[in-house]
Curated annotation (Swiss-Prot):
UniProt keyword Hydrolase present: no
Major localisation: other
PROSITE patterns: MSP
Organism phylogeny: Eukaryota, Metazoa, Ecdysozoa, Nematoda, Chromadorea
MSP domain boundaries: 9-126
SUPFAM superfamilies: PapD-like (SSF49354)
Organs and tissues of expression: Sperm.
Annotated source species: Ascaris suum (Pig roundworm)
Name of protein: Major sperm protein isoform beta
Gene Ontology MF: a single term: identical protein binding
Main function: Central component in molecular interactions underlying sperm crawling. Forms an extensive filament system that extends from sperm villipoda, along the leading edge of the pseudopod.
Length: 127
């Protein structure tokens, strides 16, 4: 069963952080490439610490081994002088899909007893 094997690695471009540059009176969009570097199909989902300011599209999906997806992270307008800009990040969670599952994302893959891995990408705001 796929759930007894830990999920393999993913690669992201950028690899360690996302940077948004001022001015923040217009919406910014940054693209992230996620690649399934492992040997099994995975389901992945994105979480953000600030859903009011940060959006992701698509927010989840399924990747076969060595397959990639381009994801957009958008930063809505905000007032940099009055907003707390610390500790924003997106988190990519991924898990193996069950053997024989269709290539369609299902939230319950993350709610069972299978291992879920996480990668955090901090958000940096250049003023």
């Amino acid at each position: 069963m796929a759930q007894s094997v830990p999920p393999g690695d993913i690669n992201t471009q950028p690899g360690s952080k996302i940077v948004f540059n001022a001015p923040y009176d217009d919406k910014h969009t940054y693209h992230i490439k996620i690649t399934n570097a492992g040997g099994r199909r995975i389901g992945w989902a994105i979480k953000t610490t600030n859903m009011r300011r940060l959006g992701v599209d698509p927010p989840c999906g399924v990747l076969d081994p060595k397959e990639s997806v381009l994801m957009a992270v958008s930063c809505d307008t905000f007032n940099a002088a009055t907003e707390d800009l610390n500790n924003d990040r997106i988190t990519i969670e991924w898990t193996n899909t069950p053997d024989g599952a269709a290539k369609q994302f299902r939230r319950e893959w993350f709610q069972g007893d299978g291992m879920v891995r996480r990668k955090n990408l901090p958000i940096e705001y250049n003023l």
